[in-house]
Amino acid sequence: MELGSLIRATNLWGYTDLMRELGADPLPFLRRFDIPPGIEHQEDAFMSLAGFVRMLEASAAELDCPDFGLRLARWQGLGILGPVAVIARNAATLFGGLEAIGRYLYVHSPALTLTVSSTTARSNVRFGYEVTEPGIPYPLQGYELSMANAARMIRLLGGPQARARVFSFRHAQLGTDAAYREALGCTVRFGRTWCGFEVDHRLAGRPIDHADPETKRIATKYLESQYLPSDATLSERVVGLARRLLPTGQCSAEAIADQLDMHPRTLQRRLAAEGLRCHDLIERERRAQAARYLAQPGLYLSQIAVLLGYSEQSALNRSCRRWFGMTPRQYRAYGGVSGR
């Protein structure tokens, strides 16, 4: 199975809460779509975008909850964007904040785009949103979740009374008028040629309260140092992808090559030119992540095994003996001081 693009696991915030609110057990859904339970609480964790949007559709259909995506946004908003949120929150204006989100949205998922249409001084500013992942059904709930999150972001950046002028969807109406009114707070149009929203030009130019240019500068520098620039070496890119792919359980040379849009043999050949092997880079990153997770006492060993891409905890035990010369429990007991 092709892994496809990834999305930041914070997009799962509130999923288990909403499922339980609707009287359903979230675990069978998470397992069916190969999403590790609890992954949304792990720093910088990513999951399969295709698995996520398919799970949203299945949840909405099987629970007979057509406004599932709109409801899920109640637990989300700007915070799901991580470091991108800090940049947006400290932009000079609402327009600047939304523009920053569009510029850096690839950090959240490379398959999502938010683009600004050209505008005149006295017109609405249009932001077009698109999920570009090929090979998946049209993500109805994914689009509605994203637009409900956009409405929350507009209120956070522009003030409690800030609202878009209009939200636009390509698909037909799914939920009730009241559901859209509560989640989006403005006119909603369906069956259009584009998905996104329009903001009044005066609201777009509104200054963001308490924005700090220095905080924005620091956050931008951090983000650009963590998410590799275009001149990063191939091995650096492989390590970065391994870090994101491990929790999906599909971290392999083939999956990494797919993310890099190259043949696995080409990947191995180019790494060999750096004196490296893909398997070794994956294992090095897995060991580093194991040490980080084992230092967090709130994580069960079974959870750590899943986050490292293992199907069984026994595989984690064997790896820890190989890496550290002791079991995971011993490693924790000794405070992370390995015998090797």
Swiss-Prot record:
InterPro entries from the UniProt entry: AraC-type_N, Homeodomain-like_sf, HTH_AraC
SUPFAM superfamilies given in the database record: Homeodomain-like (SSF46689)
Expression induction: Induced at acidic pH. Negatively autoregulated.
Domain HTH araC/xylS-type as annotated: residue spans: 236-334
CC terms in the record's Gene Ontology section: cytosol
Presence of the UniProt keyword Transcription in the record: yes
GO molecular function: DNA-binding transcription factor activity; transcription cis-regulatory region binding
Gene disruption phenotype: Mutant displays altered colony morphology and cell wall structure, reduced contents and altered composition of mycolic acids along with the accumulation of saturated C24 and C26 fatty acids, and enhanced susceptibility to antibiotics, detergents and acidic pH. Also impairs ability to survive in activated macrophages, but not in resting macrophages.
PTM annotation: Phosphorylated by PknK. Phosphorylation increases affinity for the mymA promoter.
Keywords per UniProt: DNA-binding, Phosphoprotein, Transcription, Transcription regulation, Virulence
Domain of life from the UniProt record: Bacteria
Pfam families (UniProt xref): Arabinose_bd (PF12625), HTH_18 (PF12833)
Gene Ontology terms describing biological process: cellular response to acidic pH; positive regulation of DNA-templated transcription
DNA-binding region per Swiss-Prot/TrEMBL record: 254-275, 301-324
Purpose: Regulates the expression of the mymA operon (Rv3083-Rv3089).
Protein name per the record: HTH-type transcriptional regulator VirS
